C-alpha cells in the first residue's frame, strides 16, 4: 500500500532522521485507530528503510474486555507477521498518570530486552492539541505547554512520535480507506475522564465557534514553545554553574539580577528542582525572586520538607531543618546501675 500519508511520513523521516535506516523499532500497539494506522504505515515503509519491527501491547487490566483487546492485537500482529509482546499490569493502576508511568516503564524494559533502539507511539496532532489545552487549563509554565515532543530520550532508548502531523480524523480515514480492523475502546466515551470531555465537548465547540482548524493551531503553538524550551534549556545549562553553588546549596542573587526575567525564573527553577521533591510552583519561584532585593537575613516561608531559603550576603542559601536528636539508648537489662553517690 502507498498513499499520501505514506509519502508524507517517508519525506518527514528522511528530513528528520528520527528512525534511521536499519533501526530495530518497538511499536506501541493498543489496537485503536491511531496505533493501527502507525503500524500499517511503518510496515509499508519497512522495505525502503530496512527496519526490524516488533510490537508491544500493554494490558492495564482496567476493563472487562482487556483480555479480548490483547487477543485482538496478537491476532492482528500475527496476520501482519509482526512479533508482538503482551505485558499485563501486575497491579491495577490507580490513576491515568500511574498507568502512563507504567506504560513507559514497559516500553523501556521491553525495548532493552529485545535490543530495540527506538520506541514509537501513535500520538497525533489531536493528542498534542488536547494536551496543551489540559495543561493550560490546569495552570503551567510555557515549558509545560511544549507538550508531546516528536522525539525524546527514554533512558538509553529514543522515543519517537511519527504521527504528530496527522489528526485523529485522518488516522480514522486511513484505517477506513485501507479496511484496517480497529479495537473500539468504550472508555474513550466516558466523560468522567477530563481528556475525553475535552475531546468530545470542548474541541468540537472550539472548532464550531472559533476555529475549524483549532487542533492544528494548538499543535503549532506547542511546536513553537518546544523550540523556545530547547533554547532556554541550553542557556540554563550554560549559565547554571555561574549562579548555582552546590555546597552548601545556594543561588548567587547578585549574578541572578543580571539576567532577564525569563532566565531568572528558569535558573531558580533549575536550583529548586535539585532540592525539592514536590511543591515547585509559580508562587515558590516568585518568593525566591523577591529575595534578590531584600535585606540580609530575609527568608522565605517554609518549603516542602521543612526547608526554607535565607539571604546571606550575596547568596540565597537553602536551609534544611535540623535532624531530630537521636532517641536515648535504653540500658542493657543485663547491666546493673551504679550505686548512688553518698550525700555529704
UniProtKB/Swiss-Prot annotation:
CDD domains: TilS_N (cd01992). ATP binds at residues 30-35. Keywords: ATP-binding, Cytoplasm, Ligase, Nucleotide-binding, tRNA processing. Pfam families: ATP_bind_3, TilS. Transmembrane segments: none annotated. Coiled coil: none annotated. Its main location: cytoplasm. Residues 323-344 are annotated as: Disordered. InterPro entries: Rossmann-like_a/b/a_fold, TilS/TtcA_N, tRNA_Ile_lys_synt, tRNA_Ile_lys_synt_N, tRNA_Ile_lys_synt_subst-bd. It catalyses: cytidine(34) in tRNA(Ile2) + L-lysine + ATP = lysidine(34) in tRNA(Ile2) + AMP + diphosphate + H(+). One of its GO terms (cellular component) is cytoplasm. It comes from the Bacteria. GO terms for molecular function: ATP binding; tRNA(Ile)-lysidine synthase activity. One of its GO terms (biological process) is tRNA modification. Its EC number is 6.3.4.19. It is an enzyme of class 6 (ligase). NCBIfam families: lysidine_TilS_N (TIGR02432). The N-terminal region contains the highly conserved SGGXDS motif, predicted to be a P-loop motif involved in ATP binding. Belongs to the tRNA(Ile)-lysidine synthase family. Ligates lysine onto the cytidine present at position 34 of the AUA codon-specific tRNA(Ile) that contains the anticodon CAU, in an ATP-dependent manner. Cytidine is converted to lysidine, thus changing the amino acid specificity of the tRNA from methionine to isoleucine. This is tRNA(Ile)-lysidine synthase. The lineage of its organism: Bacteria, Bacillati, Cyanobacteriota, Cyanophyceae, Acaryochloridales.
Amino acid at each position: 500500500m502507498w498513499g499520501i500519508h505514506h509519502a508524507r511520513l517517508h519525506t518527514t523521516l528522511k528530513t528528520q532522521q528520527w528512525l534511521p535506516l536499519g533501526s530495530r523499532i518497538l511499536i506501541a500497539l493498543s489496537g485503536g485507530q491511531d496505533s493501527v494506522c502507525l503500524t500499517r504505515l511503518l510496515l509499508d515503509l519497512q522495505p525502503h528503510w530496512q527496519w526490524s519491527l516488533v510490537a508491544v501491547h500493554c494490558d492495564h487490566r482496567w476493563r472487562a474486555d482487556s483480555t479480548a483487546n490483547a487477543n485482538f492485537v496478537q491476532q492482528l500482529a500475527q496476520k501482519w507477521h509482526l512479533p508482538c509482546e503482551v505485558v499485563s499490569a501486575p497491579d491495577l493502576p490507580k490513576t491515568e498518570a500511574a498507568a502512563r508511568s507504567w506504560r513507559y516503564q514497559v516500553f523501556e524494559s521491553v525495548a532493552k530486552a529485545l535490543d530495540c533502539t527506538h520506541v514509537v507511539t501513535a500520538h497525533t496532532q489531536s493528542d498534542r492539541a488536547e494536551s496543551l489545552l489540559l495543561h493550560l487549563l490546569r495552570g503551567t509554565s510555557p515549558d509545560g505547554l511544549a507538550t508531546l515532543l516528536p522525539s525524546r530520550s527514554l533512558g538509553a532508548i529514543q522515543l519517537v512520535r511519527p504521527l504528530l502531523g496527522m489528526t485523529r480524523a485522518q488516522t480514522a480515514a486511513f484505517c477506513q480507506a485501507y479496511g484496517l480492523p480497529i479495537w473500539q475502546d468504550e472508555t474513550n466515551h466516558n466523560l468522567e475522564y477530563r481528556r475525553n470531555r475535552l475531546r468530545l465537548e470542548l474541541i468540537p465547540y472550539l472548532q464550531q465557534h472559533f476555529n475549524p482548524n483549532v487542533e492544528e493551531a494548538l499543535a503549532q503553538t506547542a511546536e513553537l514553545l518546544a523550540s523556545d524550551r530547547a533554547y532556554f534549556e541550553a542557556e540554563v545549562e550554560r549559565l547554571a554553574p555561574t549562579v548555582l553553588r552546590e555546597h552548601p546549596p545556594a543561588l548567587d542573587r547578585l549574578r541572578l539580577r543580571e539576567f532577564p526575567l525569563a532566565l531568572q525564573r528558569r535558573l531558580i527553577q533549575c536550583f529548586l528542582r535539585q532540592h525539592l521533591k514536590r511543591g515547585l510552583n509559580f508562587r515558590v519561584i516568585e518568593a525566591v525572586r523577591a529575595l534578590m532585593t531584600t535585606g540580609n537575613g530575609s527568608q522565605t516561608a517554609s518549603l516542602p520538607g521543612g526547608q526554607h531559603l535565607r539571604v546571606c550576603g550575596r547568596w540565597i542559601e537553602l536551609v534544611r531543618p535540623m535532624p531530630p536528636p537521636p532517641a536515648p539508648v535504653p540500658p542493657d537489662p543485663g547491666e546493673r546501675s551504679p550505686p548512688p553517690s553518698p550525700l555529704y
